[in-house]
A protein has these predicted regions:
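Canonical Rossmann dinucleotide-binding motif of NAD(H)/NADP(H)-dependent dehydrogenases/reductases
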Residues: 2-34
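Conserved glycine-rich Rossmann-like NAD(P)H-binding loop of the short-chain dehydrogenase/reductase
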Residues: 30-46
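The beta1-alpha1 cofactor-binding region of Rossmann-like NAD(H)/NADP(H)-dependent oxidoreductases
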Residues: 41-42, 61-72, 104
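Substrate-binding pocket helix/loop in short-chain dehydrogenase/reductase
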Residues: 98-99, 103-108
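Active-site helix of classical SDR
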Residues: 122, 157
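Residue(s) in the substrate-gating loop at a strand-loop-helix junction
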Residues: 141
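SDR active-site lid
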Residues: 174-244
């Protein structure tokens, strides 16, 4: 796989941390040309420093909810580096709280970044990807397979990403383009710790206990996730599962489309995120 990405133009959103940063570092090691972006300017600068100066790099700061910024960014990438070979839509956010406690504008923000951000990036770069017979990689989640209490907004956004990506793959069948839907399980990133809590669970669990519960679920490193994604993208796999937990959840959700929640509760044990007693 080491030569597949050499000199390929790779666009990565969410490159300031987590999976996005790990993808940037791994691709840089393989000689890729990088276009990195994030809303977090400080984190993005740190990623650029980690990548080093041996690769051609663009780095831009913008909000995935800004449609005009994304359209301009796609033009800038093509004019500066050339048409993109790979686009990795990684950027995302979440919140904590049940639907009844979550303001509508908070739901809209999560959808705007997680779903519409992916749609905007896909639209903006699609002509470039088609011209290169490249690959579009959209990050969904295991929460694109199952509902999960306290994550109404996040699950809705990730189901939407999955549906959009799988349908786009059907529409572009025969074009030579790869369309990948990626479903990570628990990844050791800061997305949960950065999440705003609209309301904590009624079981009295503190924010620290919730963060600890997320950490316990995070069984896969960003570096491992990046390697799995790149291996799958190189093969233009339509669905990429990351982690043993993702494989289990995918299987259980298909075998028990209605009763999976009870099965997964037994599998995972008591969980302060779900509102169970600690």
């Amino acid at each position: 796989m080491s030569d597949i990405y050499k000199n390929k133009i790779c666009v990565i959103t969410g490159a300031a941390s987590g999976i996005g940063r790990a993808l940037a570092i791994t691709l840089a090691e393989q000689g890729a040309v990088l276009a990195l972006s994030d809303i977090n300017e400080t984190g993005l600068s740190e990623t650029v420093e980690m990548v080093g100066g041996s690769n051609k790099i663009m780095n831009d700061v913008f909000d995935m909810a800004d449609a005009e910024a994304i359209a301009s960014y796609a033009q800038k990438v093509e004019q500066t580096l050339g048409a993109a070979d790979y686009v990795f839509n990684v950027a995302g956010l979440t919140r904590v709280g049940n639907f009844v406690d979550t303001p509508l504008e908070s739901m809209e923000k999560v959808m705007d970044v997680n779903y519409w951000g992916v749609v905007r990036m896909s639209k903006a770069f699609l002509d470039q990807i088609l011209s290169k017979k490249g690959t579009l990689v959209n990050i969904s989640s295991v929460f694109g397979f199952i509902g999960y209490a306290g994550q109404t907004h996040y699950c809705a956004s990730k189901f939407a990403v999955r549906g959009f990506t799988e349908t786009l793959a059907q529409e572009l069948k025969g074009t030579g383009v790869g369309i990948c839907s990626v479903h990570p399980g628990g990844i050791a990133t800061n997305i949960a710790r950065n999440a705003i809590a609209d309301k904590l669970p009624d079981n009295g669990a503190s924010r620290e206990e919730m963060d600890a519960a997320f950490d316990k679920m995070a069984i896969t490193s960003p570096e491992k996730a990046a390697k799995v994604i790149l291996k799958g993208a190189a093969k233009k796999k339509q669905r990429i599962l990351i982690g043993s937990d993702a494989r289990v959840i995918s299987l259980v959700s298909r075998l028990f489309p209605v009763g999976y929640s009870k099965i997964l509760e037994k599998y995972s044990g008591n969980n302060v995120i779900l509102g169970d007693k600690p």
